[in-house]
Amino acid sequence: MIEFVYPHTHLVAGVDEVGRGPLVGAVVTAAVILDPARPIVGLNDSKKLSEKRRLALFDEIKEKALAWSLGRAEPEEIDELNILHATMLAMQRAVAGLKIVPEYVLIDGNRCPALPMRSLAVVKGDSRVAEISAASIIAKVTRDAEMAALDLSYPQYGFAQHKGYPTAFHLEKLSEHGPTEHHRRSFGPVKRALGLVC
């Protein structure tokens, strides 16, 4: 992996998203500005960490970061805009919510939303940039908790296990029970469950 070279600036925010692929729930984004004086050991892509480690880092990031913020786009917005544009909107909301305005924003992936400050897309940024790793952890722990809460309301779908992703079990239950109000109606499997496509 090529080492990431940071821009020559002080206040750098990292941004990442969780939940582009699931059939249910919001896409959740986070923006984090870390404090160089309070380093956090063990930051990595949230998907590569155990749930226990993610939860511990989640608390440490919230305590030590100079600023952090969540952004989201709800299923209705995803259906109206499409998942890419909804994700960009959620990222804009996360950056706008920071209590400190960053000088530079590093975004995980290959494209940036329109922002009022300089930004750069970093491919595999969640493994290469500490601020993006921190954002991925904040976003994933938040969205996983939302799926666990949704699981209590709709236990038959197994949301706590698959987090809304289109697993065989989820697709089976979607076919059996139909979609909830939280499902994304523009996604193919949900359309099929509604009888909108063959």
Swiss-Prot record:
Single GO term (MF): RNA-DNA hybrid ribonuclease activity
Cofactor binding notes: Manganese or magnesium. Binds 1 divalent metal ion per monomer in the absence of substrate. May bind a second metal ion after substrate binding.
Binding, a divalent metal cation: D16, E17, D108
Obligatory cofactor(s): Mn(2+); Mg(2+)
UniProt record, GO biological process: DNA replication, removal of RNA primer; mismatch repair
Keywords: Cytoplasm, Endonuclease, Hydrolase, Manganese, Metal-binding, Nuclease
Subcellular location: Cytoplasm
Name used for this protein in its record: Ribonuclease HII
Organism: Enterobacter sp. (strain 638)
Species lineage: Bacteria, Pseudomonadati, Pseudomonadota, Gammaproteobacteria, Enterobacterales
